Amino acid sequence: MSDWNPSLYLHFSAERSRPAVELLARVPLENVEYVADLGCGPGNSTALLQQRWPAARITGIDSSPAMIAEARSALPDCQFVEADIRNWQPVQALDLIFANASLQWLPDHYELFPHLVSLLNPQGVLAVQMPDNWLEPTHVLMREVAWEQNYPDRGREPLAGVHAYYDILSEAGCEVDIWRTTYYHQMPSHQAIIDWVTATGLRPWLQDLTESEQQLFLKRYHQMLEEQYPLQENGQILLAFPRLFIVARRME
């Protein structure tokens, strides 16, 4: 599991794209020229940006070679760069930085967010959506299984929180719109939940394990999911998925 799997990621493309659609709807810009899609993945969010601003120069950034290859194939009119978000520098100041479900993987948000704001033109917008599910059973159980099986903690850190991000971005000279939403995704089985998180949050826990260790981990994880996520009357499972949204406009 050394690289991201675009096919597995896109298995839930509608559910993953919905937050991007709702984030984009809150971006208060009519005309933009330069746009960066940070953590563009296979290009599903980049496609939304291109649909809204077909004349814009859009650059997608991702550290995964597989994701970049998929995005280039899907959107040949956009530019895609394989790079670390923290180190990438645009050639010119940007009108919009769009980051859908990517910045949660990076540390030091107290430094990262002001840095991203500095890449914007005056009146430019930083639009961010991050999963806020560190305390949800899906992610708590990852840590519990790893502890049971004596594996090191490989999960990401929790988000800084609404009040912290408001202060960070206000102090960086932004007008801030911030909100939190919980989606309830209908899952047909507990295995479907595993399929979902295997493409994202579970990757760090599995990537250094042998095949037999992965099987043991996933078997125990499945057992614990069954205890935490009961079936609805129709046999479906409701997967609660909180997400944090930020639209910050640079006022300086």
UniProtKB/Swiss-Prot annotation:
One of its GO terms (molecular function) is trans-aconitate 2-methyltransferase activity. Signal peptide: none annotated. GO terms for biological process: methylation. It catalyses: trans-aconitate + S-adenosyl-L-methionine = (E)-3-(methoxycarbonyl)pent-2-enedioate + S-adenosyl-L-homocysteine. Transmembrane segments: none annotated. InterPro entries: Methyltransf_25, SAM-dependent_MTases_sf, Trans-aconitate_MeTrfase, Trans_acon_MeTrfase_C. Its EC number is 2.1.1.144. Keywords: Cytoplasm, Methyltransferase, S-adenosyl-L-methionine, Transferase. It holds the Pfam family Methyltransf_25. Monomer. NCBIfam families: PRK01683.1 (NF002463). PANTHER family: TRANS-ACONITATE 2-METHYLTRANSFERASE (PTHR43861:SF1), TRANS-ACONITATE 2-METHYLTRANSFERASE-RELATED (PTHR43861). Catalyzes the S-adenosylmethionine monomethyl esterification of trans-aconitate at high affinity and of cis-aconitate, isocitrate, and citrate at lower velocities and affinities. Belongs to the methyltransferase superfamily. Tam family. This is Trans-aconitate 2-methyltransferase. It comes from Escherichia coli (strain K12).
